[in-house]
């Protein structure tokens, strides 16, 4: 499949993408990063509806849409009819009736998108910007793009995902696709935040068992808004037991990279001074987020043409 010929009706989960489609999106993101342009004969309208706080995902989608020449219809939850009790379904039904081509949505409800993509009335396409602790496909794709740029392949790479596993949509999206692409996965973090689901994709370990063996060390944000982690750990204890300290950083392979979906809780998941260390690709992830989201929006617009 050519990188600029992928066409998607919606993008709601990594599970709905084939390996071929994933690679096409990654390669198209790299092409956009290298200066490729997309040209459209007509204007397209994209609405960004974020029902949870977001900086990177929200603004990266906006920049991606602007770079593609789309008209943006930004949606402020605080001033919308959501405050009058309007359901998500009726909000998106309205967007569809107004002629919006794509709705990018972040919502706290897991699988919120199912009734939207199954509706015979809603014609707008749905791009999932994160559904509770469910899926985060655009973050997963930018992570994959970052790894692919570094190593040129996924087969045989050793990847450790460490931290707040159970509450992380990033972990769930990444474990599924990385396993499919041939990576060897390890999961580290507090036992309280490990569900059996992860054991189907990799091995549970301590961070000290793998930090010197893996190619990718991916830390996860502690999800303060989804649980009270300080009832189990102090910030200092969490960092000492499960975070990236200087000593652990020094043990990483010279060719290994450090990743985090951000925002980083500095001195909790990663020592403050290591966030921009030489092995860190956290800033690169943010940059790649714009270009892979350009690839996503382009692919969905192509899907609407069919």
From Swiss-Prot:
Function: Catalyzes the condensation of carbamoyl phosphate and aspartate to form carbamoyl aspartate and inorganic phosphate, the committed step in the de novo pyrimidine nucleotide biosynthesis pathway.
Class of enzymatic activity (EC top level): transferase
HAMAP family with a match to the protein in the record: Asp_carb_tr (MF_00001)
Protein name: Aspartate carbamoyltransferase catalytic subunit
Source organism of this protein record: Streptococcus gordonii (strain Challis / ATCC 35105 / BCRC 15272 / CH1 / DL1 / V288)
Gene Ontology biological process terms from the UniProt entry: 'de novo' pyrimidine nucleobase biosynthetic process; 'de novo' UMP biosynthetic process; amino acid metabolic process
Residues at which L-aspartate binds: 84, 169, 221
The EC number(s) this enzyme carries: 2.1.3.2
Name of the gene this protein is made from: pyrB
Matches recorded under Pfam families: OTCace, OTCace_N
Subunit record text: Heterododecamer (2C3:3R2) of six catalytic PyrB chains organized as two trimers (C3), and six regulatory PyrI chains organized as three dimers (R2).
Keywords: Pyrimidine biosynthesis, Transferase
Catalytic activity as recorded in UniProt: carbamoyl phosphate + L-aspartate = N-carbamoyl-L-aspartate + phosphate + H(+)
Family from the record: Belongs to the aspartate/ornithine carbamoyltransferase superfamily. ATCase family.
């Amino acid at each position: 499949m050519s990188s600029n010929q992928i066409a998607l009706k919606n993008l709601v989960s990594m599970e709905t993408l084939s390996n071929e489609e994933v690679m096409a999106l990654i390669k198209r993101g790299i092409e956009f990063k290298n200066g490729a342009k997309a040209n459209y004969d007509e204007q397209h309208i994209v609405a960004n509806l974020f029902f949870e706080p977001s900086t990177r995902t929200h603004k990266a989608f906006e920049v991606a849409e602007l770079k593609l020449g789309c008209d943006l219809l930004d949606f402020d939850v605080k001033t919308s009819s959501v405050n009058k009790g309007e359901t998500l379904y009726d909000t998106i039904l309205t967007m569809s009736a107004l002629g919006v081509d794509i709705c990018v949505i972040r919502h706290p409800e897991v699988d919120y998108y199912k009734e939207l993509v199954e509706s015979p009335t809603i014609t707008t396409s749905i791009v999932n910007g994160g559904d509770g602790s469910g899926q985060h496909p655009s973050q997963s794709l930018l992570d994959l793009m970052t790894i692919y740029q570094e190593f040129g392949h996924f087969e045989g790479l050793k990847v450790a995902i460490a931290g707040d596993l159970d509450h992380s949509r990033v972990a769930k999206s990444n474990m599924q696709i990385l396993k499919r692409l041939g990576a060897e996965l390890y999961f580290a973090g507090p036992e309280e935040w490990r569900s059996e689901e992860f054991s189907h994709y990799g091995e549970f370990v301590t961070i000290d068992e793998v930090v010197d063996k893996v190619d990718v060390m991916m830390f996860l944000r502690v999800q303060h808004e989804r649980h009270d982690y300080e009832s189990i750990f102090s910030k200092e204890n969490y960092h000492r037991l499960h975070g990236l300290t200087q000593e652990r950083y020094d043990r990483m392979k010279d060719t290994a990279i450090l990743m985090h979906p951000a925002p980083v809780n500095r001195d909790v998941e990663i020592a403050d001074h290591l966030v921009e260390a030489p092995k860190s690709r956290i800033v690169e992830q943010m940059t790649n987020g714009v270009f892979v989201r350009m690839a996503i929006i382009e692919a969905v617009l192509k899907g609407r043409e069919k």
